[in-house]
Curated annotation (Swiss-Prot):
UniProt keyword annotation of Cytoplasm present: yes
Subunit structure: Interacts with ABI1. Part of a complex that contains SOS1, ABI1 and EPS8L2. Interacts with FASLG.
Superkingdom of origin: Eukaryota
GO molecular function, one term: guanyl-nucleotide exchange factor activity
UniProt keywords, alphabetically: Cytoplasm, Phosphoprotein, SH3 domain
Residue list for modification Phosphoserine: 238
PTB domain sequence ranges: 28-155
Annotated organism of origin: Mus musculus
Annotated region (Disordered), positions in chain: 152-245, 429-452
Major localisation: cytoplasm
PROSITE patterns, A to Z: SH3
Name the UniProt record assigns to this protein: Epidermal growth factor receptor kinase substrate 8-like protein 3
PANTHER family: EPIDERMAL GROWTH FACTOR RECEPTOR KINASE SUBSTRATE 8-LIKE PROTEIN 3, EPIDERMAL GROWTH FACTOR RECEPTOR KINASE SUBSTRATE EPS8-RELATED PROTEIN
Length: 600
C-alpha cells in the first residue's frame, strides 16, 4: 500500500481539526470538593468569607471533602460521582456569578472558588474545590471560556435549546460580561457584599443591565435598596458553659437513640403481625403518638444547636461526625413518620447561626437535600427568622434528668476549679452574664459592706481582675488591670467610675484591692499602658499587643498593622491569622472599640 501524499494527509488533518472544533465543549476534570457555603448568613456574606471559613476548618481538621468530577456539558456545570458517574449537583453556566482562585492559603494550595445562583432558589452559594490534577488557574480559564461560548451560542428573543429544559426563568438577551473578580486574599480592601436574597422570580433577568450582572461588584446589604434588614436578635445568648452543654448533648442524643430504638422495635413487631390502622386518635400506624415524634424532632434541632456551640472543643468525635450519625437516624425516623409535613411544623427551637454554619459546612449533598426538605423552620436561624417568635424550648428527658443551672450562675468559690477540656485560652471566671444589674433584692448580699464613699473620705480605688462587657446603659465596660473608683458597694453589683469619668455597675467579684503600699486615689504603676487608637502606627500597635501579654507570634503577625486596620479586622480574619489567641484578641478589640465609640 502506497504512502498517502502530503496533500492527502494535510486535508485529512484539516477535516479532523474542523470536526473537533465544531463539537460542543466538554470539559471534565477530577477535583476535590471541599465545601459549599451559602452566602448571606451571619458569618459568610461574600466569597472570600467562604475561603476564610475553609481556612478555619482546615486548621481544626474539620474539612470533609469528596473527590468528584467537575464537568461542563450542554450549558450546565455538573458534579459527578467518581465511580458511578451519578449526578450529585448541577448549575446552569449562566447562573455563575464569579469564578476565582486562591493559591497557597492553607493546606489546600490550589483552590477554585465558584459562586453560583442555585436554579429556582433565592440563595447564592460559593463552592470551593481543590484542583490537584489540573491547576485552579487553568480550570478557571477553561470555565470562563465555556461560559463565554454558552452565552454567545444562546439564541435571542426567548428561544432556548433543549439543554435549558430544566430552567424555569427567561433567557438573557445579551451575554454575561466576564470580568476578573477581586482576589480572595484582599482582606483590607473595601468590602463587596451580596445584595439581600430575593425570590428567583421577583426580578426578571431580562430587565437587568449588563453592569449589574458584572462579576466584580456585590452591593452592601447596608446600601439603601428598599430591603428591610431583619430585626435584631430577640433573645440573649445563653451563658457559656461547655461542660453543661456536653452533659445536655449526651442526654439529648441518648433520647434520640431511645426513640429510634422504639421505632425499630415496633417495626420488627409489625413485620410479624399486621396491625390495624387508626385504632386511636393521634396515633400513627406504629402506635407512637404525634407528640413523641415532635419531641424527637425538637431534640434533633437542639442537638444541632449544641454541636454548633461545642464544635471547636470536641476532641474524640468531631461535630461533623455527630451530624452524620444524627442524619442517618433522622432519615430512618422520617421513613416511619406517618405525617410527611410534621417536621416543618416544629418551629421551636430555632437553629442558631452557629448550627446553620455547621450544617452548611459538613452536610453531604443527599443530607443537604434532606435538610432543606424539612422546611424553613429547620434551615433559618433565629437571627434571620421573620415569623412570630416561638415559645422557648424546655426539653424533658426519658430518665427524668433535668438540665442543671449554668455554672456561670454558681457562687464564685465553685468557679475557680472550672476548666475547659482542650482549651488553650487563659482561664477566666464566668460571671452571671445573663443577669444585668437591677435593684431587685436577689442582687443584695448581706456579707458585703454596706457603705459608699462620703465626701470627707478618700475615694476607694480598686483594680479590675477580669474584663467585663456592659450589656445595657446601667453597666460599665472595664478592662483587666484598670483602676476604678468605687462609688457604691451596697449591693452585689458595685457602682464604679473609671478614669474617663464614666460610671456604671459591674460585678463586685471582678475587683481586688490595690497592692499594699500603693497610694490610694492614684495609679500604683508609674508605667502607663499604651492605648490603641484608629490613628495608632505599627510601632504603637506592637506596644499595645505586648502590653496585653499576647504571644510573640501574635505580636509579630499583627504588629505590622495600623490601628485602623487592626480595629476593623473581623473575627474570621483574626481566627485565620492567630487561631490560638483569636478569642482573647477579639475581646480586647471589642473593649477598645466601645471605648472609642466604634459601631464595628
Amino acid at each position: 500500500m502506497s504512502r498517502p501524499s502530503s496533500r492527502a494527509i494535510y486535508l485529512h488533518r484539516k477535516e479532523y481539526s474542523q470536526s473537533m472544533a465544531s463539537e460542543p465543549t466538554l470539559l471534565q476534570h477530577r477535583v476535590e470538593h471541599l465545601m459549599t457555603c451559602k452566602l448571606g448568613t451571619q458569618r459568610v456574606r461574600e466569597p472570600k468569607d467562604a475561603l476564610q471559613k475553609l481556612q478555619e476548618m482546615d486548621a481544626q481538621g474539620r474539612v470533609w471533602s469528596q473527590d468528584l468530577f467537575l464537568q461542563v456539558r450542554d450549558g450546565w456545570l455538573h458534579l459527578l460521582d467518581i465511580e458511578t458517574k451519578e449526578e450529585l449537583d448541577s448549575y446552569r453556566l449562566d447562573n455563575i456569578k464569579a469564578i476565582d482562585v486562591a493559591l497557597n492559603t492553607c493546606s489546600y494550595n490550589s483552590i477554585l472558588s465558584v459562586t453560583v445562583q442555585e436554579s429556582g432558589l433565592p440563595g447564592i452559594s460559593t463552592l470551593l474545590f481543590q484542583c490537584q490534577e489540573v491547576g485552579a488557574e487553568q480550570l478557571r480559564t477553561s470555565l470562563q471560556k465555556a461560559l463565554e461560548e454558552e452565552l454567545e451560542e444562546r439564541p435571542r428573543f426567548g428561544v432556548h435549546h433543549p439543554s435549558q429544559d430544566r430552567w424555569k426563568g427567561p433567557p438573557l438577551e445579551r451575554p454575561l460580561p466576564i470580568q476578573q473578580a477581586p482576589p480572595l486574599e484582599q482582606r483590607f480592601s473595601p468590602e463587596h457584599r451580596f445584595p439581600p436574597e430575593q425570590p428567583h422570580n421577583m426580578t426578571s433577568e431580562r430587565s437587568i443591565s449588563p453592569s449589574s450582572r458584572s462579576l466584580t461588584h456585590y452591593p452592601s446589604a447596608r446600601e439603601p435598596n428598599g430591603f428591610t434588614l431583619p430585626p435584631p436578635p430577640r433573645r440573649a445568648p445563653s451563658p457559656e458553659d461547655p461542660e453543661r452543654d456536653e452533659e445536655v448533648l449526651n442526654h439529648v442524643l441518648r433520647d434520640i437513640e431511645l426513640f429510634a430504638g422504639k421505632l425499630k422495635e415496633v417495626q420488627a413487631r409489625n413485620s410479624h403481625k399486621k396491625t390495624k390502622l387508626g385504632r386511636k386518635k393521634k396515633k400513627s400506624k406504629n402506635g407512637i403518638t404525634q407528640a413523641e415524634y415532635i419531641d424527637c424532632f425538637q431534640k434533633i434541632k437542639l442537638s444541632f444547636n449544641l454541636l454548633g456551640k461545642l464544635a471547636l472543643r470536641m476532641q474524640e468525635t468531631s461535630a461533623p461526625e455527630f451530624v452524620g450519625l444524627i442524619f442517618q437516624t433522622l432519615k430512618f425516623i422520617l421513613s416511619q413518620c406517618p405525617e410527611a409535613g410534621l417536621p416543618a411544623k416544629v418551629i421551636s427551637p430555632l437553629l442558631t447561626p452557629k448550627a446553620i454554619d455547621l450544617l452548611q459546612s459538613c452536610l453531604s449533598p443527599p443530607e443537604d437535600t434532606l435538610w432543606k426538605s424539612l422546611g424553613t423552620s429547620w434551615t433559618t436561624s433565629w437571627a434571620d427568622w421573620t415569623g412570630s417568635e416561638p415559645p422557648p424550648y424546655q426539653p424533658t428527658f426519658y430518665d427524668g434528668w433535668q438540665i442543671p443551672q449554668p455554672r456561670s450562675m454558681m457562687p464564685i468559690t465553685n468557679q475557680d476549679s472550672i476548666s475547659l477540656r482542650g482549651s488553650r485560652m487563659r482561664s477566666s471566671l464566668h460571671f452571671p452574664r445573663d443577669e444585668p444589674y437591677n435593684h431587685n433584692p436577689e442582687y443584695e448580699d448581706s456579707n458585703l459592706p454596706l457603705s459608699s464613699p462620703s465626701p470627707g473620705r478618700a475615694a476607694l480605688k480598686m483594680q479590675v481582675l477580669y474584663e467585663f462587657e456592659a450589656r445595657n446603659a446601667q453597666e460599665l465596660t472595664v478592662a483587666q488591670g484598670e483602676i476604678l473608683e468605687v462609688l457604691d458597694q451596697s449591693k452585689r453589683w458595685w457602682l464604679v467610675k473609671n478614669e474617663a469619668g464614666l460610671t456604671g455597675y459591674i460585678p463586685s467579684n471582678i475587683l481586688e484591692p490595690l497592692p499594699a503600699g500603693a497610694p490610694r486615689g492614684h495609679r500604683q504603676p508609674s508605667f502607663r499602658a499604651p492605648m490603641l487608637r484608629l490613628s495608632s502606627k505599627p510601632e504603637e500597635v506592637t506596644a499595645w499587643l505586648q502590653a496585653e501579654n499576647f504571644s510573640t507570634v501574635t505580636v509579630r503577625t499583627l504588629g505590622s498593622l495600623m490601628g485602623s486596620q487592626l480595629l476593623h479586622m473581623r473575627p474570621g480574619e483574626l481566627q485565620m491569622l492567630c487561631p490560638q489567641e483569636a478569642p482573647r484578641i477579639q475581646a480586647r478589640l471589642d473593649a477598645v472599640r466601645r471605648m472609642l465609640g466604634m459601631t464595628h
